[in-house]
Regions:
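Short glycine/proline- and aromatic-enriched beta-strand/turn motifs that initiate or cap beta-hairpins
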Residues: 1-43, 107, 146, 207
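Repeated loop/turn-to-beta-strand initiation elements of outer-membrane beta-barrel proteins
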Residues: 29-35, 71-77, 106-112, 138-144, ...
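Detector for outer-membrane/organellar transmembrane beta-barrel domains
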Residues: 91-151
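Sequence/structural signature of outer-membrane beta-barrel proteins
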Residues: 2-8, 36-49, 80-89, 113-121, ...
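Outer-membrane beta-barrel "beta-signal"
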Residues: 164-173, 179, 192-207
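Residues that define the transmembrane beta-barrel architecture of outer-membrane proteins
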Residues: 15-19, 55-59, 92-98, 122-128, ...
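Surface-exposed loop and membrane-interface regions of Gram-negative outer-membrane beta-barrel proteins
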Residues: 11, 28-92
Length: 207
């Protein structure tokens, strides 16, 4: 459960709460696969019923492989297919993305995402992100990242996004609070949905 679903600095729920769930499988070899879902809302509240896109749910399917390179570095490569079942006839947002991650020193991660059919537009995009995660007293975890979403081929614009937050686990219960924002180019593409915002999350993990 999240007070809002934010993806790369943009609200995916018109700044409303989101219900989210996932099912994951991981093998000792490093192979993993899973399904992740969330409620979404891409149309403004004042949109006429006949102009609604019908996309109320996002379901992502992913497979990947992760392994250590040495005592300092590890990598993770995956493929994700973002789908939006229920979208009205003639509307198709589904698209694929390849994601590679390189993690070093146990805290720093560089991520590169590439799609050849971004938002089902037939255009390419790249996403670059650098982030870190640190343990704090009282079993808190601090994480922060900054990213650059190259959408020039899609929107003739690209933008920078960043986030910082705290999280803590209480057994099977995970609680988090994060701050998200983008630069002015993000708001040129997505308007107020890409401005600054705080998001609270509450999750349950079942092994």
């Amino acid at each position: 459960l999240a007070s809002e679903y934010v993806f790369r600095g943009q609200s995916q729920t018109q700044e409303d709460p989101a219900f989210q769930a996932s099912v994951d499988y991981a093998h000792a070899s490093g192979f993993y696969a899973g399904i992740w879902g969330s409620s979404v809302d891409f149309t403004a509240e004042d949109t006429l019923p006949e102009d609604e896109d019908g996309a109320d749910v996002e379901i992502d399917y992913y497979v990947g492989f992760a392994s250590d390179i040495n005592d300092t570095f590890s990598y993770d490569v995956s493929g994700v297919y973002y789908t939006y079942p229920g979208a009205n006839d003639g509307i198709d947002y589904d698209y694929p993305e390849l994601i590679g991650k390189l993690t070093g020193w146990g805290w720093a991660t560089f991520t590169l995402g590439y799609s050849w059919d971004t938002f089902n537009s037939g255009e390419t995009s790249f996403y670059y992100n650098f982030g870190g995660e640190w343990g704090l007293p009282w079993e808190l975890t601090l994480d922060s990242s900054i990213g650059y979403y190259d959408l020039d081929s899609v929107f003739d614009e690209s933008y920078v996004d960043w986030q910082i937050g705290l999280s803590r686990s209480f057994g099977f219960l995970d609680v988090g609070a994060h701050y998200y924002d983008t630069n002015s180019d993000g708001e040129l593409i997505y308007g107020d949905l890409a401005d600054s915002r705080f998001v609270l999350t509450l999750g349950f993990t079942i092994d």
